[in-house]
């Protein structure tokens, strides 16, 4: 019998579970203050939903053996858009939903097998509004989310913002047969692949210029305007940065415009963004999101209000960045209730109830304790830091 978890899956210890719950609880309280209501889509969906109408590769979905094509969700947005377009179709727009739950991705391991990537996410979806103010609302909420999570201040946070239409504008000047290859190089910032790309040298230098363009929004927008002139995408980004950049700066978050910002999934059409944290090794993407109007259109039976934008936060990744000093439990005291005679068990249960009423964690010895060694061993095994004796 194999007693290990499936390849890529993992067990979380009590401390990790507690931190996940604490982070998710703080986020849910914030979402509700902003008027978002909880929705809980199923873990199992039909494959045509999970592939997000072609936005997600079929190979990345962990499939279930059944009479119809089913799988485990690799992300939650597609399921919520499906629900908004069916069960909540008659509801007035905009819809503000938040969710928290586990997603499952299927990756190919080095040996050709399958690795399961299980992750706990928390996020919001704003469906049914086209206004740029919706984008500003989502980014503002993401910025405020960082404040309630209380990430250790030693980690530097960067908010990267891009636009798929801006990326398409950049790619439009290249041969259509090479667009996919160039897009991958741009999105991956793959300088090595660029050196072997079969294009003219001036085109190679132009691609490199775009790859190096990420930085302060005002400077990047000026550079893009010098190349492409004024257009609606650049104008909207200017308007957005006017509000978002000062808000982020107040919270110590650097904002950068990245013309090459792409996503693994082809869900997004318009604004895209990623929140990246420095770490002891490599940068970590702890949140990502964007506009997915095209996805809403594909799922909707109506042509009206087919707009959507959202983000998801990786609670598992955030957990590793939260300062241990910021773990605010109701009470960090854990009491062992001990007794020397079995007849005192009833009194011990009454004492435990009183401690619980005060919000104090307490456990009862299952046997009478007669020696100091027994008592100390039980304190250690139950991870208690205080003892109360029942006479």
Swiss-Prot record:
Provide the GO MF annotations for this entry.
histidine-tRNA ligase activity
Q: Does the keyword Repeat apply?
A: no
Amino-acid biosynthesis is among the record's keywords = yes
Task: Recite the UniProt keywords alphabetically.
Answer: Amino-acid biosynthesis, Cytoplasm, Histidine biosynthesis
Pfam families membership:
tRNA-synt_His
Its signal peptide is: none
InterPro entries for this protein: aa-tRNA-synth_II/BPL/LPL, HisRS-like_core, HisRS/HisZ, HisZ
Q: In which pathway does it act?
A: Amino-acid biosynthesis; L-histidine biosynthesis; L-histidine from 5-phospho-alpha-D-ribose 1-diphosphate: step 1/9
According to the UniProt record, one GO cellular component term is: cytoplasm
Tell me which Gene Ontology terms the entry assigns under biological process. histidyl-tRNA aminoacylation; L-histidine biosynthetic process
Cellular compartments annotated: Cytoplasm
Gene3D superfamilies xref list? Bira Bifunctional Protein, Domain 2
The UniProt subunit note reads as follows: Heteromultimer composed of HisG and HisZ subunits.
Which purpose does this protein serve, as stated in its record?
Answer: Required for the first step of histidine biosynthesis. May allow the feedback regulation of ATP phosphoribosyltransferase activity by histidine.
Question: What is noted besides the main data?
Answer: This function is generally fulfilled by the C-terminal part of HisG, which is missing in some bacteria such as this one.
Q: What family does the database annotate?
A: Belongs to the class-II aminoacyl-tRNA synthetase family. HisZ subfamily.
Q: What is this protein called?
A: ATP phosphoribosyltransferase regulatory subunit
**Encoding gene (name):** hisZ
């Amino acid at each position: 019998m194999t007693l290990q978890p499936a390849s890529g899956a993992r067990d979380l210890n009590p401390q990790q579970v507690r931190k996940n719950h604490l982070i998710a609880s703080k986020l849910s309280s914030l979402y509700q203050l902003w008027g978002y209501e909880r929705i809980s889509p199923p873990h199992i969906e039909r494959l045509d939903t999970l592939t997000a109408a072609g936005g997600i590769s079929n190979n990345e979905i962990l499939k279930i053996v059944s009479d119809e094509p089913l799988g485990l969700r690799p992300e939650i947005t597609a399921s919520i858009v499906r629900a908004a377009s069916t069960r909540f179709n008659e509801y007035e727009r905009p819809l503000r939903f938040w969710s928290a739950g586990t997603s499952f991705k299927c990756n190919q391991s080095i040996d050709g097998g399958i690795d399961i990537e299980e992750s706990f996410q928390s996020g919001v979806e704003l469906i049914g509004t086209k206004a740029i103010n919706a984008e500003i609302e989502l980014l503002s909420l993401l910025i405020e989310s960082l404040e309630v999570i209380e990430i250790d201040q030693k980690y530097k946070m960067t908010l990267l913002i891009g636009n798929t239409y801006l990326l398409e504008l950049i790619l439009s000047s290249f041969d259509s047969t090479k667009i996919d290859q160039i897009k991958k190089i741009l999105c991956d910032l793959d300088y090595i692949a660029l050196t072997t790309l079969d294009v003219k040298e001036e085109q190679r230098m132009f691609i490199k210029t775009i790859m190096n363009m990420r930085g302060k929004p005002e400077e990047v927008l000026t550079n893009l305007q010098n190349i492409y002139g004024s257009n609606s995408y650049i104008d909207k980004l200017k308007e957005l940065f006017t509000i978002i950049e000062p808000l982020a700066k107040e919270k110590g978050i650097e904002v950068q415009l990245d013309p090459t910002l792409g996503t693994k999934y082809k869900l997004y059409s318009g604004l895209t963004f990623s929140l990246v944290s420095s770490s002891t090794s490599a940068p970590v993407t702890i949140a990502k999101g964007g506009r997915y109007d095209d996805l809403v259109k594909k799922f909707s039976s109506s042509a009206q209000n087919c707009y959507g934008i959202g983000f998801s936060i990786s609670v598992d990744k955030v957990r590793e960045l939260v300062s241990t000093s910021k773990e605010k439990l109701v009470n960090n005291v854990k009491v062992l209730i001990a007794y020397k005679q079995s007849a005192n068990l009833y009194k011990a249960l009454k004492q435990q109830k009183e401690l619980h009423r005060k919000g104090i964690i307490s456990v009862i010895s299952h046997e009478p304790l007669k020696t100091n060694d027994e008592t100390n061993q039980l304190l250690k095994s139950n991870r208690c830091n205080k003892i109360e004796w029942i006479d």
